[in-house]
């Protein structure tokens, strides 16, 4: 149902949909190979939007049965008794929390000393505490050195930063150490298109590659690998091709972890502001003090807003709690227009709603929150 709507949109907008594997023949031509054979197509412009795929590691060979990527994890036919998630990032924690709720004993192994390193540190600590309450276990500062698959499970050898070795058995292992751009098999090097050291396509501010007629957007170009970022780039790219002047503010692309509770963020973290020596203020408000959160049995978490000490302009915001992904949109909008915490504080928010927590966090920048 989710994907069939795309086919409808193709028909509605009179777009020809070709199914097959494509690669460049030259700068103006692609070859499409399908079950019906091969055919070349020429065009004035091309947009490469081939997405990304899970990073593979030789020591952890994926078979999508016992050692799986996020794709394989969604196709498991039964709930594994034990699941090891390799990587404490967004996708691994999302998948791990799902299987934990379904009954798996989930362990997360992460090479760093914290989960989701891009996340605001205070939020990350609260997030891990919440996941631990749900039964997830964490092995931080550990890396997987080898795996051995058998009928009885997967023996996983791990090493800590202090060189201690351990081996444990799991029913299923989920590989989630990041994603890579899907640029292989397109013959990009063959036509002279430039890639960076991570095999992402190099583009300018108008999504144009070093080849005049070829553009690229989404996960195949540098930047966060987020569907909504790719969508914005797709629209902007076509507008550039048609002579318009679109705008994307990459400093305020929201990021959301779809767990329970959700985690949402936009803009700068506290550590980033400290490193940049920016003088800032913090306003926080707990959902425990929000009437709607209490009546829906979701009092966990809080809203955190960071604002410039002098101008009061919002520099970043971080939310952990129910519907965090919905609540962050108001702050993203405010930031897009260069708004301040006072702008949010002065807006009437409906009662009872969890959005009131955003208003109170904004008010608390100056210690004016009412309900705490």
Where in the sequence are the language-model features?
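Rossmann-like dinucleotide-binding cores of NAD(P)H-dependent redox enzymes
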Residues: 1-3, 7, 74-75, 80-84, ...
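A short alpha-helix-loop-beta-strand transition element characteristic
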Residues: 16, 53-55, 138-139, 194-197, ...
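A conserved short coil-to-beta-strand element within the FAD-binding core of flavoproteins
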Residues: 16-30, 140-153
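Glycine/serine-rich phosphate-binding loop and adjoining beta1-alpha1 elements at the start
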Residues: 19, 25-66
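Core beta-strand elements of the Rossmann-like FAD/NAD(P) dinucleotide-binding domain
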Residues: 36-45, 163-172, 210
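Glycine-rich dinucleotide-binding loop and its adjacent helix/turn
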Residues: 48-105, 109, 134-138, 189-210
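FAD-site-proximal beta/loop scaffold in flavoenzymes
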Residues: 63-80, 168-242
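Flexible, glycine-rich terminal cap/loop adjacent to redox cofactors
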Residues: 242, 259-269, 274-372
């Amino acid at each position: 149902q989710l994907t069939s709507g795309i086919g409808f949109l193709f028909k509605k907008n009179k777009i020809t949909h070709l199914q097959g594997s494509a690669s460049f023949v030259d700068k103006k031509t692609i070859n499409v190979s399908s079950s019906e054979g091969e055919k070349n197509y020429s065009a004035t412009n091309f947009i490469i939007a081939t997405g990304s795929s899970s990073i593979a590691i030789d020591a952890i060979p994926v078979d999508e049965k016992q050692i799986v990527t996020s794709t394989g994890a969604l196709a498991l036919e039964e709930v594994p008794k034990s699941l090891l998630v390799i990587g404490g990032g967004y996708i691994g924690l999302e998948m791990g929390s799902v299987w934990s709720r379904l009954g798996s004993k989930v362990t997360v192994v992460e090479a760093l000393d914290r989960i989701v390193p891009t996340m605001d540190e205070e939020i990350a600590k609260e997030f891990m505490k919440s996941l631990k309450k749900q039964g997830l276990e964490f092995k931080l500062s550990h890396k997987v050195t080898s795996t051995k698959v058998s009928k009885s499970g997967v023996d996983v050898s791990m090493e800590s930063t202090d060189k201690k070795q351990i081996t444990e058995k799991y029913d299923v292992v989920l590989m989630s150490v990041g994603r890579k751009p899907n640029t292989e098999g397109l013959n990009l090097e063959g036509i002279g298109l430039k890639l960076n050291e991570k095999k992402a396509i190099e583009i300018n501010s108008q999504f144009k590659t070093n080849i005049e007629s070829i553009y690229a957007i989404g996960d195949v170009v540098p930047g966060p690998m987020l569907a909504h970022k790719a969508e914005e780039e797709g629209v902007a790219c076509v507008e550039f091709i048609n002579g318009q002047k679109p705008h994307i503010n990459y400093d305020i692309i929201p990021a959301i972890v779809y767990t329970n509770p959700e985690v949402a963020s936009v803009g700068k973290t506290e550590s980033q502001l400290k490193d940049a020596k920016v003088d800032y203020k913090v306003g926080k408000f707990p959902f425990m003090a929000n009437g709607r959160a209490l009546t829906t049995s979701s009092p966990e978490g809080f809203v955190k807003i960071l604002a410039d000490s002098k101008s009061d302009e919002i520099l970043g915001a971080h939310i952990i709690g129910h519907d965090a992904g919905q609540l962050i949109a108001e702050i993203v909008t405010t930031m897009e227009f260069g708004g301040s915490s006072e702008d949010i504080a002065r807006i009437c928010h409906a009662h009872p709603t969890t959005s009131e927590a955003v208003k109170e966090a904004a008010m608390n920048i100056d210690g004016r929150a009412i309900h705490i």
